[in-house]
UniProtKB/Swiss-Prot annotation:
InterPro entries linked to this entry: BioW (IPR005499)
Pathway annotation from the record: Metabolic intermediate metabolism; pimeloyl-CoA biosynthesis; pimeloyl-CoA from pimelate: step 1/1
GO biological process entries: biotin biosynthetic process
Disulfide bond recorded as keyword: no
Annotated protein name in UniProt: 6-carboxyhexanoate--CoA ligase
An MF annotation (GO) of this entry: ATP binding
NCBIfam families: bioW (TIGR01204), PRK01322.1 (NF002360)
Known partners and oligomeric status: Homodimer.
Organism: Bacillus subtilis (strain BSn5)
Length: 258
């Protein structure tokens, strides 16, 4: 599809030094854009990093690089919002949705037992649905999904059609979840934010799409979660490489999302 050159733009911000020096993660961002959008995109990422509710960063890195790989275009996952009254209800629903996506109850509980230990992991944890064990070797870094985006005009058209607020947070989360789910090794994703002011989370997968859950934690809580439940019989290193390096653009088509 690509005649235009695209660039991967990444931002990360932390407090009390860089992430490598043990600093507290404040904010991050990923964009995949043509060059003429560079200045606007960098400014938006700068603003995002400087105005996050997790704190004021004293370290920030914004970098961009040309993307040489062919860009794949995929559809966004279908979206459904589940209204719940409290985090306990939200977490109970999340477990049920994970089970419906093909993760056994035993493996779900094994993951939940370890989620508190993973609260400092900056990226995602890969968890095998067969063994109930963590598959990535990235420790506190986690796996960072990169090189994906959803062009604003198409996202806004989708949001209007789907009766969803055209908020950048939804755009970024759904673009990431759609890329994660697209790969054959993916079974399900469990996520809630480390932002103390944002309590909505989701379960995503191929069977039921992107299932938003309106309360997954209490306000003021800075512990987030991102777990990818995967079929470990696939090549895990290939999956990690694709998550980090394969460029993906989301493009919604109305007739596809009936």
């Amino acid at each position: 599809m690509q005649e235009e050159t695209f660039y991967s733009v990444r931002m990360r911000a932390s407090m009390n030094g860089s992430h490598e020096d043990g600093g507290k993660h404040i904010s991050g961002g990923e964009r995949l854009i043509p060059f003429h959008e560079m200045k606007h995109t960098v400014n938006a990422l700068l603003e995002k990093g400087l105005s996050h509710s997790r704190g004021k960063p004293d370290f920030m890195q914004i970098q961009f690089e040309e993307v040489y790989e062919s860009i794949k275009t995929i559809q966004p996952l279908p979206v459904h919002t589940n209204e719940v009254s409290c985090p306990e209800e939200g977490q109970k629903l999340a477990r049920l949705l994970l089970e419906k996506e093909g993760v056994s109850r035993d493996v779900i509980e094994k993951a939940y037992e370890q989620i508190p230990e993973w609260s400092d992991v900056r990226g995602a944890v890969l968890f095998d649905i067969h063994t109930g064990k963590r598959m990535d070797q990235t420790k506190e870094k986690g796996v960072r999904v990169s090189r994906m985006d959803w062009p604003d005009a198409n996202f806004e058209k989708w949001a209007l059609h789907s009766h969803v607020p055209a908020h950048s947070r939804i755009k970024e989360a759904l673009a990431l979840a759609s890329k994660v789910s697209w790969h054959p090794a993916a079974v399900a994703e469990l996520c809630w934010s480390d932002d103390p002011d944002y309590i909505t989370g989701y379960v995503a997968g191929k069977k039921m799409g992107y299932q938003r859950i309106t309360a997954m934690k209490e306000y003021g809580t800075e512990e987030g979660c991102r777990v990818f439940f995967i079929d470990g019989s696939n090549d895990v290193n290939t999956y990690i490489h694709d998550l980090e390096k394969q460029p993906i653009l989301i493009e919604w088509e109305e007739d596809h999302d009936s």
